[in-house]
Design a protein with these regions (language model features):
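Short, glycine/polar-rich helix-capping loops at beta-to-alpha or helix-loop-helix junctions
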Residues: 148-154
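A general structural motif
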Residues: 122, 143-148, 168-170, 213
Length: 262
């Protein structure tokens, strides 16, 4: 398994988005250096280039660099963000007809350039993957999502995307059951750390109350990967206030990595 660190911040709507680069670097220091790669991210914000997507120029450059980095890997990749838009290239890299996508995220990321309140890509990335045909909507599971825009609710309903609430995640098999029922043969796991309860995990730009407990998320991942092979994974949105705060949250992130590695 190879770790690919992508300290991208340009997809975030937050005025403190640069903390995402700090978070990616903090995670990198806990990873085995021999099996870790780093994708360079432009220093500049980038412009929208007529797309309606803020900072699109830089986001597209990073997507291409990440795609190139993944192409040369001999094994499964865990991509470390940065903002959660890094999952775009990572999911496309492993796309096939049997792929399921589990999206652990407080937000569904189902906006488009015409519906997004912020115009930033982190809130559009899942919609973009569906539009590109990278994954069948019937094999997408949103888990732990609890803050929706109206347009996102409409898209999830129209596409038939399955949803598992925070309460339903008390059953460690809930996600695995939904994925297996879809007929998938392998699974990509996207984890935006804001899916976690901010009372347990502090390093977030936009903490949303009443999230998933770490023990529940770890148990869910283990159950899922006990039933289907892992195609790849993302851990994104770590944004510690300081190096000291990063140390406090590190054990949680390492538990999630251990669950993904099996």
């Amino acid at each position: 398994m190879t770790f690919v660190v992508v300290p991208q911040w340009q997809g975030s709507p937050s005025s403190r988005a640069m903390r995402l680069a700090d978070g990616a670097e903090a995670i990198r220091t806990d990873l085995p250096s021999a099996s870790t790669r780093v994708v360079p991210v432009p220093l500049e914000a980038g412009d929208e280039q007529g797309t309606g997507i803020a900072r699109f120029g830089s986001i597209q450059a990073v997507r291409e660099r990440l795609a190139d980095a993944l192409e040369g890997l001999p094994d499964t990749a865990i991509v470390i963000g940065g903002d959660c838009a890094v999952s775009a290239a990572a999911v496309v890299h492993v796309a096939d007809p049997g792929l399921a996508l589990v999206w652990f995220d407080a937000h569904p990321d189902l906006n488009t350039p015409t519906t997004s309140p912020s115009g930033t890509y982190a809130g559009m990335v899942l919609a973009a993957l569906l539009e590109e045909g990278a994954v069948d909507p019937s094999r997408v599971v949103l888990a732990g999502t609890r803050e929706w825009d109206a347009a996102e609710e409409d898209m999830a309903r129209e596409k038939g995307v399955a949803t598992i609430t925070v309460g339903q995640l008390a059953d460690a098999a809930a996600v695995a059951d939904a994925v297996v029922a879809s007929g998938a043969t392998r699974v990509y796991v996207h984890i935006d750390l804001d899916v976690l309860d901010p009372a347990e995990f502090e390093g977030l730009l936009e903490p949303i109350p009443f999230g998933v407990q770490t023990t529940q998320l770890v148990a869910t991942i283990r159950e899922l990967l006990g039933r289907l092979p892992l195609a790849g994974a993302t851990i994104a949105s770590f944004a510690p206030e300081s190096p000291e705060k990063a140390v406090d949250d590190a054990p949680t992130i390492l538990r999630l990595i251990a669950a993904l590695r099996g």
